[in-house]
Regions:
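Class I S-adenosyl-L-methionine
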Residues: 194-289
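Conserved beta-strand signature within the Rossmann-like core of class I S-adenosyl-L-methionine
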Residues: 177-190
Length: 289
């Protein structure tokens, strides 16, 4: 058995966001915009971001969720409380929903940015909660309830958002009374040839956990990028990664040669290969003294 990737989730996302984008006429306003904290709040860019990145990120989160399912079942978990820190449009929710088999869960997503285009994502159930909040501001008593912390390509954004954000968050998580905590970490890929600065950021959390008496047999510096060599098409890894060609964005201005759109970020190809995938699952345990 392998990770469950839903064609319906991918098609629903690409269809709804494309239909909304095609009702907008000001694509050029975000043609030079790139993924960063200052731009995530722009609804138009949120739609462009969803079209280009979310299907591939959802694919990656399915792999992580499947691995969590296997690890949690090993210990007999029947229910998990999950916090997604820097959740954005929450594609990890759908990955967890499809891959936690016979394990119920509650999902609490946190993001400092209001992703107003969340309405275009597939429907959710009562186990989903979204909080417009900086991750480091989550109360300790709330942190203490979580079994799983998901960083969906967000740890650098959390670190960059405000001074000492990551340190404050690490202090709270490491102060948890839980005996076992899982981390699902996804990073912007460095090509897996070296430990990138983004991967190193998790060291802040790791060091805090160790300082509070937690141990782990997982290597927090070791990451994975899916099956096969880097550069492999996602559909060759799993045929359910079906990004319909008809859903890709086209611009009449570019087609007619009316403007120079060589570096336009709106009509760039969506992420179809595993180049942007880099992840790990970590388990920390605190034994009674």
């Amino acid at each position: 058995m392998s990770a469950i990737v839903s064609k319906n989730v991918i098609r629903s996302i690409t269809t709804s966001f494309k239909e909304s984008l095609e009702r907008d006429s000001d694509w050029c306003e975000v043609s030079k915009t790139s993924p960063q904290n200052a731009d995530y709040g722009k609804p138009l860019y949120q739609k462009v971001y969803a079209m280009r990145y979310i299907p591939a990120y959802y694919f990656e989160y399915c792999i992580l969720s499947y691995q969590l399912n296997r690890r949690a079942k090993k210990y007999g978990y029947e229910h998990l409380e999950i916090a997604s820190l820097g959740c954005g449009l929450a594609p990890d929710y759908y990955a967890l929903k499809g891959n936690l088999i016979d394990i119920t869960f509650n999902y609490s997503g946190y993001d400092a940015v209001h992703w107003s285009t969340e309405e275009f994502m597939p429907s959710k159930e009562a186990n989903f909660a979204l909080n417009i909040s900086n991750a480091s501001q989550v109360a300790q008593e709330t942190i203490d309830t979580y079994d799983v912390f998901f960083f969906p390509k967000s740890i650098s954004d959390i670190n960059d958002h405000a001074t000492d954000n990551l340190e404050a968050l690490a202090e709270k998580i490491s102060s948890s009374k839980k005996e076992r905590i899982f981390f699902l970490n996804s990073f912007i890929s460095s090509g897996c040839s070296q430990v990138s600065n983004v991967v190193k950021l998790f060291g802040v959390v790791h060091n805090a956990m160790i300082s509070k008496g937690f141990t782990t047999s997982d290597d927090h510096k070791k990451t994975f990028f899916g099956q096969g060599p880097l550069g492999r098409y996602l559909i060759s890894i799993d045929s359910n990664f079906d990004y319909p060609p008809s859903q890709r964005l086209n611009c009449e201005r570019r087609d007619n040669g009316k403007v120079d759109c060589l570096n336009c970020n709106v009509i760039k190809s969506p992420i179809l290969r595993n180049n942007y995938i880099e992840y790990n699952l970590l388990e920390y345990i605190k034994h009674d003294n």
